[in-house]
Structures are given as structure tokens and as C-alpha cells.
Amino acid sequence: SSAASDVYKRQYLVDTLAVNKYNQGINYEKYPTELCEKAVKYIKEKKPTLTLIAWDNPDHVGHKEGHDTPAYYHKLEEIDGYIGKVMNAVKEAGILDETIFIITSDHGGINKGHGGKTMQEMETPFIISGKNIKKGHEIQASMMQFDVAATVAAIFKLKQPQVWIGRPIMEVFK
């Protein structure tokens, strides 16, 4: 309904008609491959303005086998290959010069734990590359996970909702 769409826009800053959702595949082992294939196809066909691809497989391996283990790093290498395929799809779609890539995660880990209070558990990667982004820049400011959303909002020149506590990481921009 129109009212539901308006609520969604206020809550998420986008119209429900502009959102395509792909659910995880039934076969967990095939899921990252299926997700990559769907993302590549979608990017080539639709040339989207914004795409979020969430590969949570390294998280599952970290909790099952342990973080900082050969199995965990093997899964990261696998996901790296999928990221390469997505980047190639962006290039083939002719939108590479207009694209910004952000690669991050929601938490670090020790052993098989989930987050925590140590730096190894709280630190996450934040890799950003693309249009109007400084090349080879190392972020000097401290950064929290909620700063990612604020940075994405800044990329799209959106007014940040007053209740957000995140701040855009402006030093990454040219």
C-alpha cells in the first residue's frame, strides 16, 4: 500500500519498489556461489545505484572452526574470489567509473566467540575504493560500525537522521 511504502521510506530512506531481496540458498555450501551468480547477473542487467551483498559464511566458519584458523582464512579467500567476480561484473556493466566499493564486517573474533570487548573482537576491516575515494589512504580517525551507514549516506548526499550516532568518515573522500 502507499501508506506502507511511505513508512518504509521514512524508516529506510528508500521506496519498497526500489528494493530487490535475494534470500539465502537452501544449500549452505552452495549459498555463496549462488549469491555471487545472482549478484553478477543483477549488476549486469540492472546497473543498480546501490547494491548490498552480505556473505556471512566467514562468520559461520569463525564460530564453528574458530577465527584465525586455516578454515577461516580459506573461507575469506573464497569470498575474495567472489568479490573479484562482482567487481568484474561492475566493469562489464560499464559502471566501474561511477562505483564505490565498501568491504567490511560486523565484528572480529577470538577462538569461536562472537564479538566481545577486546580489540581483536571489536576491530573490523573497512575497505573503501572507487569514485572520489582517496587511493591507498589509511584511516587515521577512530571508527565504529555505525559510521559505515553514515558514510554511505554521505556518498549519496543524504541528510543523516538526527537520531543516528554514526558519523561519516570524510577523510576517505578526495
Question: For the regions a protein language model found, what residue spans apply to each?
Answer:
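Loop/turn elements at helix/coil->beta-strand transitions in domains of secreted/extracellular proteins
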Residues: 2, 46-51, 95-101, 124, ...
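Soluble non-cytosolic domains of exported or imported proteins
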Residues: 29-34, 70-80, 139-146, 163
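Metal-dependent active-site segment of extracytoplasmic phospho-/sulfohydrolases and closely related
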Residues: 75-118, 152
